[in-house]
């Protein structure tokens, strides 16, 4: 790192700082995807619902409120404890399992919870009537099998930008 600044007598001062970092793995170095660890039992890419008492359940239908997606693509995560081991996407993008045929999804389309932990496309009427059921928006339909340096399996999932 190299910095330059002027002293009070207008002489140029330069400072160089060397910073070294050694790590087997550095989380969050480039990602802006955040997750919060919660106590839940669900696979990555599944949509889960807040039950209102601090617990989470797999989504069982469309338009359920309090929906979240379990992440295996986050860069930062907080709150891991002995009980809270399930990373829930808070912001950024996350891979999620779609209910409908993958060819029906287009970038920018709003999605809500679906049965069996899937996400489902919303109609214009549903968006107007239940905006609080929006989980996020389609970001990308992957054409690759793995993602990232950890080779996270895509497994038919699509990218959702969290609301």
What are these regions (language model features)?
Residues 1-163:
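Extracellular receptor-binding modules and their adjoining Ser/Thr/Gly/Asp/Asn-rich linkers
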């Amino acid at each position: 790192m190299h910095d330059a600044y002027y002293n009070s007598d207008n002489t140029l001062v330069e400072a160089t700082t060397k910073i070294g970092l050694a790590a087997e793995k550095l989380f969050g170095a480039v990602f802006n995807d955040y997750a919060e660890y919660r106590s839940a039992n669900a696979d990555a890419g599944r949509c889960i619902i807040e039950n209102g008492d601090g617990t989470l359940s797999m989504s069982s239908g469309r338009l359920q409120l309090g929906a979240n997606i379990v992440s295996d693509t986050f860069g930062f995560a907080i709150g891991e404890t002995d009980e809270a081991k399930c990373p829930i996407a808070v912001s950024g993008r996350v891979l999620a399992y779609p209910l409908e045929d993958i060819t029906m999804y287009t970038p920018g389309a709003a999605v809500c919870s679906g049965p069996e932990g899937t996400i489902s496309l919303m109609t214009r009427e549903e968006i107007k009537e239940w905006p609080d059921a929006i989980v996020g928006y389609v970001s990308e339909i992957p054409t690759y099998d793995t993602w990232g340096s950890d080779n996270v399996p895509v497994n038919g999932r699509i990218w959702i930008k969290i609301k």
